[in-house]
Amino acid sequence: MKIDFDQIPLKHLPNFNGGEKEFAAHMLIDENSKILLGRLIPGASIGYHRHENSYEVIYFLSGCGKALYNADETGIENAVEERIAAGDCHYCPEGHFHSLINNGDDDLVFFAVVPLKK
């Protein structure tokens, strides 16, 4: 099935998961998964959160920033900081924590998939 993100309404999510500014995305959500084309403007972030019953795969299309990643509950201060840029892929396994931060000068644009457990 082809997904035309231009035909999916853009959702504006301020302070998503406790992040800064706004996360905007075209999201296709069905009973199996959440598939999205997302954008963080410079200075915006998706807050540090846990993937309790799912995992997430993110492929970066343009821009640069950083991902904070932690495999346990020791907190954001112990998270590993990973530089991300167009062409990189970030994986957050089930039960792990992560955050995305656009600390670059351009929009950080990415494609993400989060399978939903039944």
Give short role names for the model-derived ranges:
Residues 1-34, 47, 81-85:
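A short, N-terminal "cap"/entry segment at the start of jelly-roll beta-barrel domains
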Residues 85-86, 94-118:
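Ligand-binding loop in jelly-roll beta-barrel domains
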Residues 47-49, 67-68, 92, 98-104:
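Short beta-strand His + acidic residue motifs that chelate non-heme Fe in jelly-roll/DSBH
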Residues 36-53:
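Conserved short histidine dyad/triad with adjacent acidic residue
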Residues 72-94:
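Short acidic-glycine-tyrosine-enriched beta hairpin
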Residues 27, 35-39, 57, 81, ...:
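Conserved hydrophobic/aromatic beta-strand scaffold that supports enzyme active sites
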Residues 53-66, 70-72:
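Glycine- and acidic-residue-biased ligand/ion/polar-headgroup-sensing regions
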